[in-house]
């Protein structure tokens, strides 16, 4: 009989679409974060339900050949769910997940081609969104711990461009130097709620968006000075006065530049505002669009909508 707190030796059979290892125990599926297919581990049960179990890793007794050393300084943020899995194996996992999804809707005979991967799956994101919180040391800027609103500082990130990380540090330093209050989500007080940065990978243009609770922004000139030696194209104050988890409000105030940046997908140029949707992985967006164009077999005489 499974009981919370009891430990069991298990074999991991597969990965879920959320990146959790899945085994079986007491005729029920058992889900454990951080384990890979083919691994054996000692696991402690943390949740017992009639139809499933959850556990946490106690000891990895037999690692997978596809397990790679941890490269991330922010292991608790939950942003890279299959981080321990070697990249070629991640691509195979994605292919199998698509195949499985098709099978579930009666399309199992559909051919799923191998996933087109990146040359280097690091520092590829063109957008970063950070939460801002106060601490005894002053303002902290980072990510939320998985399944919580606890803040983890983000002094580095393997999938973000290094300029995002530097902008994070500059804004945090400005807030600490001038004692600018971070947003308190319980009391709904403070000044700075969030920081968002965007980079045009082809244009090189850089956007900084500071999300504030109200229209007041103290030490504005000092913020501009703190960013002056970085290639910031535009700086925008976004005002979000609502008690909500939504990051951006509807009102923008441009402090530097035009309030937008530009970037290209193939030969098409896009104007990107703080509220714009734009694919976060620009190099793979090019790959995706190229493959779509290849499959369309266009001759140049068509009108495409």
Regions found by a protein language model. Name each.
Residues 1-305:
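Accessory RNA-recognition modules of RNA-modification enzymes
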């Amino acid at each position: 009989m499974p009981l919370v707190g009891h430990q069991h030796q298990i074999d991991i059979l597969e990965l879920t679409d959320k990146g959790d290892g899945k085994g079986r125990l007491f005729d029920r599926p058992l889900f454990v974060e951080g384990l890979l297919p083919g691994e054996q581990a000692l696991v402690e049960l943390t949740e017992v339900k009639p139809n499933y179990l959850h556990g946490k890793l106690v000891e990895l007794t037999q690692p997978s050949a596809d397990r790679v050393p941890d490269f991330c300084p922010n292991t608790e943020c939950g942003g890279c769910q299959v981080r321990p899995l070697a990249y070629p194996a991640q691509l195979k996992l994605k292919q199998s997940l698509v195949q499985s999804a098709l099978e579930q809707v009666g399309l199992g005979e559909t051919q799923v081609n191998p996933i087109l991967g990146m040359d280097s799956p690091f520092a590829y994101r063109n957008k970063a969104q950070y939460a801002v919180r106060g601490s005894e040391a002053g303002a902290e800027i980072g990510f939320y711990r998985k399944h919580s609103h606890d803040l983890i500082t983000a002094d580095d990130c393997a999938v973000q461009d290094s300029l995002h990380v530097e902008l994070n540090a500059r804004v945090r330093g400005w807030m600490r130097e001038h004692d600018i209050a971070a947003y308190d989500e319980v009391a709904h007080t403070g000044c700075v709620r969030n920081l968002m940065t965007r980079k045009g990978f082809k244009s090189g243009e850089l956007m900084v968006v500071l999300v504030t609770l109200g229209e007041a922004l103290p030490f504005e000139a000092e913020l501009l000075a703190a960013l002056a030696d970085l290639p910031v194209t535009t700086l925008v104050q976004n005002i979000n006065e609502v008690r909500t988890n939504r990051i951006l409000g509807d009102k923008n105030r441009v402090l530097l530049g035009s309030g937008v940046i530009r970037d290209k997908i193939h030969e098409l140029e896009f104007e990107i505002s703080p509220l714009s949707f734009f694919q976060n992985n620009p190099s793979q967006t090019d790959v995706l669009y190229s493959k779509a164009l290849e499959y369309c077999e266009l001759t140049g005489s068509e009108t495409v909508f």
